[in-house]
């Protein structure tokens, strides 16, 4: 939300933690997403509630020439906007959004946050994904995000819950996301 507010770019979340921009807003092939930021968090729990939260955020702000193998999957805010970006504004708005959502969770309204995550993560419904199990690669169609944050994936008549591993979005040669 901080990137959306500070830049006007309609970024999305690609489950679980990538901030991406649909190619309709850039010069890529239709249906691709370019990563502009990533979020990692850890919330150790004792009992029902987290005792602390550690959050790491990386935002690609400056224009960058990416290696050929990344150029269709990575981008930056300045590249997308074709103008300089006020880094302080991106930081302030991102921290303000984190503060707002921390308050929502603190007040016991986790479902509100989960619903917003789902709204900002359209690829979590109806997208092809491939992931590895111990036995083999599996493929399915995303079927939403569970109340505990797991990605539901429909495989025929079964629904799998993904909580960790490596996911390829789209065709098997698509974007890989480490969980």
Kindly label every feature range from the protein language model:
Residues 1-179:
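Catalytic beta-strand/loop module used to bind and position nucleotide/cofactor moieties
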């Amino acid at each position: 939300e901080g990137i959306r507010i500070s830049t006007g770019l309609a970024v999305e979340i690609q489950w679980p933690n990538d901030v991406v921009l649909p190619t309709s807003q850039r010069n890529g092939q239709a249906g691709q997403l370019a990563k502009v930021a990533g979020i990692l968090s850890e919330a150790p729990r004792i009992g029902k509630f987290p005792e602390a939260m550690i959050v790491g955020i990386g935002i690609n702000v400056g224009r960058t020439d990416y290696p050929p193998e990344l150029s269709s999957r990575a981008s930056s805010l300045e590249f997308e906007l074709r103008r300089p970006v006020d880094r302080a504004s991106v930081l302030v708005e991102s921290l303000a959004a984190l503060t707002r959502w921390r308050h929502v969770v603190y007040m016991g309204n986790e479902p509100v946050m989960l619903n917003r995550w789902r709204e900002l993560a359209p690829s979590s419904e109806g997208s092809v994904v491939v992931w590895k199990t111990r036995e083999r690669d599996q493929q399915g169609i995303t079927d939403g995000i569970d109340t505990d944050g797991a990605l539901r994936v429909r495989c025929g008549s079964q629904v799998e819950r993904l909580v960790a591993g490596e996911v390829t979005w789209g065709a098997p040669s698509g974007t890989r996301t480490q969980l």
